[in-house]
Amino acid sequence: MTKIFLNGSSSKPVNAYAFLNWYFEDQKNANSILQNKQVDSFQFFIMGNSYIASSLYLLKNILDKYNKYNVADYLIFPIFFNLTHGLECWLKASISSITYLYNDVEEFKFTHELKDLTSDLKKLLGRYNILYIFDDLSSFALIDSLVDELNQYNVRFDFARYSSYRNNSQFYCGNNNVCVDLYELFQFIITLVYSFRLSLSYLILCIDSAVQPDQEDFILFCENKANYKDNEDDEDAFENFIFKDV
């Protein structure tokens, strides 16, 4: 069998490979606890980007082909897994960034729950008077609305990963239809990129520049944000959006 993982090049063109190390070459965990927080911020940010981008790619492909053969019934699970896990990574990147920038020593509990992570992040933003980075919490509106919808169905964090747990089944196992509006979900993620991710990317920039957040600097940073518009005549528009903004 041909090897999948390679340590060097071969005769194939470079675009025949995915380089796992490409975004992580300078981010090997150091021994210093403080340094680890900085590295964690970058790594969570990058990993979150990759999962969110994957959700967008799958959704865009399904919508462009009008959900041919109803493939969304299968693909909705990796779409949701990538969305929730990517968002989890973004939230953890935000928490790590703030604790690093302000040398905060509080230990937050390990969790996968979006609601708990959001609560921890809001607490940190209030503690250091930097709520403006997330538009005075308006950037959390999308996350809060998603969490509220999931709570209506008593959804577990692993609902898109496993269809059952212990002696129970997930909420969608049964006779009643549980439908997902694919277009609304796509727009939800796009908006999430232009709100929450934009704020997080400013925190990452602060770490990279070794400065603490500043409201005027943040306003200038936001003025340069992109604005993706779905244009069916421009085949590269979506790929450019993914490359530059996700």
What are these regions (language model features)?
Residues 1-246:
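Domain-scale activation on soluble regions of proteins
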